[in-house]
Amino acid sequence: MPDELRAEKSFQSKPYDSLKNKSEFDRVYQKGFKKHNLFFSLFVLDLSKEPPKGKEGFKDPLSCRLKDKKTLYLLGLSVSKKVGNAVKRNLIKRRLRSLTLKHAALCQGLALVFVPRSDCYHLDFWALEKHFLEMLTSIKNYIEQSLKRLEKRNNSYLCETIKRLF
């Protein structure tokens, strides 16, 4: 086959990287925000708040994986055999990956872990998208509110210490 007739293969790089090992999943489970509904659980860790490299005993923090490559967010999928056979599990994983690709701007700077339940298979893509967006927006709002509260506490603490000194 001549080279001119061959189709150009232009692969777009995906904007996410996957969580690779148990320690990365455990970090998101322990330090991240959790949200549950009937169909899946969503664990979200804000990577902008991850400690820098070398602090708190982390050899390679998750936030460094975003800076090294051109990835926007990290994605982990944990689909157990209770959900169904391999065909059902792979369908759920494909749908969840495409959801995060579709809404990559919302997921930017986050590490996401999905844990689907057995009822998740019966949802169509649009219903799954609706539940995903509700959960993600509520988690992002919670993160923003907690940051504001933390900033207020730190500012008031600084004001009190300055008043004590002078």
Curated annotation (Swiss-Prot):
Task: Tell me if RNA-binding is a UniProt keyword of this record.
Answer: yes
Keyword Hydrolase found: yes
Task: Please list the reactions this protein catalyses.
Answer: Endonucleolytic cleavage of RNA, removing 5'-extranucleotides from tRNA precursor
Gene Ontology CC, one term: ribonuclease P complex
Supply the alphabetized keyword list.
Answer: Endonuclease, Hydrolase, Nuclease, RNA-binding, tRNA processing
One Pfam family name from the record? Ribonuclease_P
Provide the E.C. number(s) assigned to this enzyme: 3.1.26.5
GO terms, molecular function: 3'-tRNA processing endoribonuclease activity; ribonuclease P activity; tRNA binding
Q: Tell me which Gene Ontology terms the entry assigns under biological process.
A: tRNA 5'-leader removal
Q: Which PANTHER family match?
A: RIBONUCLEASE P PROTEIN COMPONENT
Q: What does this protein do?
A: RNaseP catalyzes the removal of the 5'-leader sequence from pre-tRNA to produce the mature 5'-terminus. It can also cleave other RNA substrates such as 4.5S RNA. The protein component plays an auxiliary but essential role in vivo by binding to the 5'-leader sequence and broadening the substrate specificity of the ribozyme.
Alphabetical list of NCBIfam families matching this protein: rnpA (TIGR00188)
Description of how the protein assembles with itself and partners: Consists of a catalytic RNA component (M1 or rnpB) and a protein subunit.
The entry sums up its family as follows: Belongs to the RnpA family.
Full protein name? Ribonuclease P protein component
Its source organism is Helicobacter pylori (strain HPAG1)
Gene this protein is translated from = rnpA
